């Protein structure tokens, strides 16, 4: 798949967004900051990525996901947990960043902060029914299948 990308921050020309390995599902996104930013415990910030994308095809969407090391080692996760980018969005990608940890974290300019994953999308056509055909699970919700 080809992805139309606008580079909005000239520094990205030297460090184009890329997949870290041939098996990586996520394209690394960088913090396009002008200076280091201290993320205090409990604080949230919108961090620019310096790029915009246009998927154009309604059969695709993009997800902004946290980098596992940032969350596990430093408590830096996404403020919205997952960022959903619709196929018709054309603005700059922003990363909602939340320091859920108990110590301040310094985010440096051009540091890899999150990753972008392209996923297929199926838009459902609603079929209104009076009842569902019975299934083994039925309406059993949280924890209804037991611990394994």
UniProtKB/Swiss-Prot annotation:
Protein family per UniProt: Belongs to the dUTPase family.
Pfam families the record matches: dUTPase (PF00692)
EC number(s) stated in the UniProt entry for this protein: 3.6.1.23
The protein's name: Deoxyuridine 5'-triphosphate nucleotidohydrolase
Catalysed reactions, as listed in the record: dUTP + H2O = dUMP + diphosphate + H(+)
InterPro entries in the cross-refs: dUTPase (IPR008181), dUTPase-like (IPR029054), dUTPase-like_sf (IPR036157), dUTPase_trimeric (IPR033704)
Binding positions for substrate per the UniProt entry: 67-69, 80, 84-86, 94
Entries under NCBIfam families matching the protein: dut, PRK00601.1
UniProt entry tagged with the keyword Magnesium: yes
Function per UniProt: This enzyme is involved in nucleotide metabolism: it produces dUMP, the immediate precursor of thymidine nucleotides and it decreases the intracellular concentration of dUTP so that uracil cannot be incorporated into DNA.
Cofactor: Mg(2+)
Catalytic class of the enzyme: hydrolase
Pathway the protein acts in: Pyrimidine metabolism; dUMP biosynthesis; dUMP from dCTP (dUTP route): step 2/2
UniProt keyword annotation of Metal-binding present: yes
HAMAP family according to UniProt: dUTPase_bact (MF_00116)
Keyword terms: Hydrolase, Magnesium, Metal-binding, Nucleotide metabolism
GO terms (BP aspect): dUMP biosynthetic process; dUTP catabolic process
An example molecular function term from Gene Ontology annotations: dUTP diphosphatase activity
